[in-house]
Amino acid sequence: MTVRLSIHETLQNEMMRLPWYLYLFTYYLKCRFFKERTPLLAGFKITSRCNLSCLHCPFWERNPPKVITFHQVKNILSTLHELGIRILILEGGEPFLWKEGKHTIHDVVEVAKSLFFSVGITTNGTFPLTIKAHTIWVSIDGLKETHNQIRENSFDKAIENIQKSSHPNIYANITINRINYQEIPALVKFLTGKIKGITIQFHYPYKKGDTLTLSFEQRKVVLDNLITLKKAGYPIADSYLCLESLKDNSWDCQDWMLANVEPDGSINLGCYVKGRGKVQCKICGFAAHTEISLAYKWHIESILVGKKIFRYGSTMQDL
């Protein structure tokens, strides 16, 4: 019996084999005109274990599940690929702590590179930055005294590892809160020349009684400062439109473009907070959500930000 595929099914099958630029263009057409809701970017919390106890982070406090095996990790990565994911970010906890038998996070990255256009990793910077991911984010949340207050005396080691690394695509990611927001301009100036660029996000209140979340008035001051610094040539990677949109969250969130994997291997589709805390869209400060949503709306600046940060199509000889 001959089975005829619909135009939609044929398009979907062909997309699995496309190079990055054709895949993303076809992805856009499929989602816009066929009303598909296919995720594109996934964050994989490969472990909740961490060697630090950061003030703003709820994940290290959670009882770590049994370590997922390398075999399970490979199956999860394959599932993400089948779902349509083409950009992967490995997270924790501290992802460099993941280990199963002889396998380490380096092996996970090698497998992931065979499946995704771009593989990134977010780290606290206390381990050598020798991993061959396309992009490395190091969390830096203040100048030395402030960072150490938030991130348990890890500033010197993080900066040392950044400066020792030969990786060409290291970004600093700043989580902005009531402790550090007034020194963000000084931090940006300190980091300039040490990293490829700087991305930001605002602290999200996962816990009850949280006191670290900024008011929108404070947020606006920070964002205006970042816009001024970006105009002056400092390496703020987030787009102008993203920074402006975060002032009052006047952007249309496309959370269906996202997927999240928990340390136990379960997969959630949608908002980063889903299954991790109470979803409060009004106070969202995840600039990555903002940027990908703006890119879907065909804002060229946001599209170019994604291409620059994720280095689609780059080979490991480039790293």
Features from the language model and the residues they span:
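Processing junctions and N-termini across compartments
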Residues: 44, 48-51, 247, 275-278
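Local cysteine-cluster metal-coordination motifs and their immediate loop/turn environment
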Residues: 49-59, 255, 279-288
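Radical SAM enzyme [4Fe-4S]-AdoMet core and its adjacent flexible, acidic
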Residues: 1-5, 102-106, 115-118, 134, ...
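Flexible mid-to-C-terminal extensions adjoining Fe-S/redox cofactors in radical SAM and related proteins
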Residues: 264-319
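Conserved alpha-helical substructure of the radical SAM core
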Residues: 8-128, 132, 311-314, 319
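Conserved residues at the C-terminal ends of beta-strands
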Residues: 60, 91, 139, 201, ...
